[in-house]
Amino acid sequence: VDEEKIKNQRQRARKLGALKLDTLTKSISKPLRDVLKAYDYELAVLHPFEATLADLTVRARAKQGHQSLPEVLKAVNELRKSVLETGKRHAAAAKNATSKQEAIEATEAGFREVESLMLEGADVVLNLIDVQKALRKIPIVQLGMPTVVLVGAPNVGKSSIVRAISSGTPEVNNYPFTTRGMTLGHLQYEDWAEGQCQVMDTPGVLNRPDEERNEMESLTLASMLHLPTAVMFVLDLTGNSGALSSIENQIQIRNGLRARFPKRPWVDVISKADLPMDQEDPAVARAPAGALKVSVADGTGLADLEARVKEMLLDVREVLSAIGLAEGPGGRVEGEGSGG
């Protein structure tokens, strides 16, 4: 009788120990596995503009000394596999124990080792949480809404124009990878069935090759490439925007982007028209023909600009309707690839 009792106690201890360890490891590994699967899925189905923003955010974190997203996800997966392996090993030891006490000791040893792994891997989980927090901070842009993007070199007056032509007070979107906010306004047209459109300034673009561009410039190019946009290229010909925004640089930036995106609805705008141009700079003579002269300070040209913006947005809407994206999730304008 005593032997039978001892045998039953041993079997119960074996079974209970293996079950406890299995439950523990699954309670840890399954959520980690679900997170990894969710990242794989989301990264695969992200809109190209969202994917660019996510990539820029993670790249900026990496430059600050943080792990890249692939490194973070790899570390999480390694932690998950370690917990599973440890749990299975100790569960097998408990299941094959020759006594009740041995089964209990194997179970307790498994709990201690899993706990130790999780304590040592706390930074892995915290890194994942930090990445998620950074990605959640990315402002939301209406991906399928017709949009006018204001593009140009730094300090040429783009955000002032956004504020001047927006139907209401624009908001400032702050991205995790830049200290400069991006002003986002809306235009409301009562004679359109879906009358709201977006207008946003973008970070300044410098006169340099793509491989030398920073995250802010990449954001500007992504908005031109991946959103249903018309382009307002803003030039300041006063000569007061700084060396990086010299008139020569501005014109070269403009010509390069126009060649890259030849099918986009486009308007050239000379800002600060209330101030004299730098007539001593020979580059002024090469300013694009037909550019609208605008001054936010005294209202010069704003009515003409607003009319032109509406025309361009109508063109964008017609393209979206033709490809079935007028009310969908958005995408790039038909007929333009990465090279425009």
Where are these regions (language model features)?
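Glycine-rich phosphate-binding P-loop
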Residues: 146-167, 180
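Canonical P-loop GTPase G-domain recognition
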Residues: 274-331
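Conserved, well-folded catalytic cores of nucleic-acid-processing
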Residues: 82, 86-93, 131-138, 164, ...
